[in-house]
Design a protein with these regions (language model features):
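Surface/interface-facing alpha-helical segments and adjacent flexible terminal/loop regions used
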Residues: 1-160
Length: 160
């Protein structure tokens, strides 16, 4: 196989490397394995999954904050449905080793920043907590309605 196959045709490269690795697993001596790129790709698989979970978490928080901030918007039903889809996807992809890497507070701040200038139906959002009121277990395990109530309670605490 050509040396530049990795750069030209990722599918053909990955199929060829998988074939070579199967031969190595059977005990054959194979000198063609592109170890540098194989190692890089294995590392990228984990990072890709982590980034997907982080993206879903961000979207979950954005949608919870939208529902909380603009509860009378006609879009609330859609936001709730999208939240559930992001939650299911994140929970399905989440692995315990990700827990130590995910910075939930940062993702919450990013969601707040994203909504800072949002204006739905010409209204500003209701007050919301500056700090993330959720933990990962709640975000992955709790029902949407329970998370909305938790956010509501946290926001009520800042009004006093």
């Amino acid at each position: 196989m050509p040396d530049d196959l990795y750069d030209r045709d990722a599918l053909a490269w990955s199929e060829h490397q998988a074939s070579l690795l199967r031969r190595v697993a059977r005990g054959e001596r194979v000198n063609e394995v592109d170890w540098e790129h194989v190692i890089e790709e294995i590392e990228d698989v984990g990072l890709s999954e982590l980034h997907a979970v982080q993206s879903d978490l961000h979207q979950m928080m954005v949608h919870l904050l939208k529902v909380h901030g603009w509860p009378s918007s006609p879009s609330v039903g859609r936001w709730r449905g999208e939240f559930v889809a992001f939650q299911k996807d994140a929970a399905r992809r989440f692995a315990p080793s990700m827990r130590q890497t995910i910075d939930l507070a940062r993702h919450y701040r990013d969601a707040l920043e994203q909504l800072e200038t949002a204006d739905y139906e010409g209204t500003s959002p209701r007050a919301r907590p500056a700090d993330c009121p959720f933990n990962l277990d709640q975000l992955f395990g709790d029902k949407r309605a329970a998370l909305e109530q938790h956010l509501e309670a946290a926001a009520a605490g800042i009004k006093a």
